Amino acid sequence: MTNIRKTHPLAKIINNSLIDLPAPSNISAWWNFGSLLGVCLILQILTGLFLAMHYTSDTTTAFSSVTHICRDVHYGWIIRYMHANGASMFFICLFMHVGRGLYYGSYLFSETWNTGIILLFTVMATAFMGYVLPWGQMSFWGATVITNLLSAIPYIGADLVEWIWGGFSVDKATLTRFFAFHFIFPFIILALVMVHLLFLHETGSNNPSGIPSNSDKIPFHPYYTIKDIMGALLLILALATLVLFSPDLLGDPDNYTPANPLSTPPHIKPEWYFLFAYAILRSIPNKLGGVLALIFSILILAIIPLLHTSKQRGMMFRPLSQCLFWLLVADLLTLTWIGGQPVEYPFITIGQLASILYFMILLVLMPIAGIIENNLSKW
């Protein structure tokens, strides 16, 4: 009798995705981040569900309801901090996952890569809306500043902003709709993840060498299931350490003050994972230009496959490109630091230089390095 997991319509899908999936024999720990993102997503949906049971999306009670969760709900504090810090872990895994794709040339699977970019935008939108919900000072002013950026759109900008706000300022209507969207988006993300995996399984995984691995495949289970469980345990350990020892390490103290439309905080800044994009936005003195640079800083990923000049897929055997890649990582860390600094000398100049370098590396230097390396290899 044939095994049920190979015949049952539902079990067959799971089997072909997680058990009998042929996987390259040499994929490193950098390939763990996909499954870790799945763990993060499930964790966020579960903790978010329990938070939503006690949260109220009304401007008068939102802040108090979060306090109530932390003080009165059984283990409410750990659920709240797991959700808040889980978002940080989510973004750490996301950045590592995208970085892996850039380094090893995984972007040449264009459908998988493009669905990944859509996922990145959706996760960023979800995280932004979630940050508004506690209705602290930084929630309110962050929402005001970021939604206001849409007013830079010519002709329809001002109307668009009022339409999103549901009034003439960020108020009750805004909070309610942000809560509704924040609740539904993770399920949209879940559906997009299925599409992402569908496209990935059409081609199979890339591997560190960048050479097709069809001649050397191993079953996903038990080799990579055990490896993924190991990764998940390390992720949960890191998250637990963060939640139990320094839950407010990555947060903003301003968000412990209830939202007050009459008092602007001295430094408005988003969560740490948006700081690199925020720094790029701020480094351009023109409003529309800044907004375009902000969007393009993420959208640039979509044209990376078109800029691939090397005859090798990954950067494993390309020292010039490797240097540029790690320069890009250092540049992004610099931008993240600048995004959290006040708008004054020398931070403005550093931010502008780092922003120029970011676009230079991706649009100019990396394609040139690919051509140089081809010539060096006499190809």
From Swiss-Prot:
Location of the protein in the cell: Mitochondrion inner membrane
Annotated positions binding a ubiquinone: H201
One Gene Ontology cellular component: mitochondrial inner membrane
Binding-site positions, heme b b562: H83, H182
Assembly mode: The cytochrome bc1 complex contains 11 subunits: 3 respiratory subunits (MT-CYB, CYC1 and UQCRFS1), 2 core proteins (UQCRC1 and UQCRC2) and 6 low-molecular weight proteins (UQCRH/QCR6, UQCRB/QCR7, UQCRQ/QCR8, UQCR10/QCR9, UQCR11/QCR10 and a cleavage product of UQCRFS1). This cytochrome bc1 complex then forms a dimer.
Cited function: Component of the ubiquinol-cytochrome c reductase complex (complex III or cytochrome b-c1 complex) that is part of the mitochondrial respiratory chain. The b-c1 complex mediates electron transfer from ubiquinol to cytochrome c. Contributes to the generation of a proton gradient across the mitochondrial membrane that is then used for ATP synthesis.
Cofactor binding note from Swiss-Prot or TrEMBL: Binds 2 heme b groups non-covalently.
Annotated S-S bridges: none
Keywords annotated in UniProt: Electron transport, Heme, Iron, Membrane, Metal-binding, Mitochondrion, Mitochondrion inner membrane, Respiratory chain, Transmembrane, Transmembrane helix, Transport, Ubiquinone
Keyword Mitochondrion: yes
InterPro entries: Cyt_b/b6_C, Cyt_b/b6_C_sf, Cyt_b/b6_N, Cytb/b6-like_sf, Cytochrome_b, Cytochrome_b_C_euk/bac, Cytochrome_b_N_euk/bac, Di-haem_cyt_TM
Primary localization class, coarse: mitochondrion
Note: Heme 1 (or BL or b562) is low-potential and absorbs at about 562 nm, and heme 2 (or BH or b566) is high-potential and absorbs at about 566 nm.
Cofactor: heme b
Binding-site list for heme b b566: H97, H196
TM ranges: 33-53, 77-98, 113-133, 178-198, 226-246, 288-308, 320-340, 347-367
UniProt-recorded Gene Ontology molecular function terms: metal ion binding; ubiquinol-cytochrome-c reductase activity
Phylogenetic classification of the source organism: Eukaryota, Metazoa, Chordata, Craniata, Vertebrata
GO biological process, one term: mitochondrial electron transport, ubiquinol to cytochrome c
UniProt similarity note: Belongs to the cytochrome b family.
Name of the protein this chain belongs to: Cytochrome b
Recorded topology in the membrane: Multi-pass membrane protein
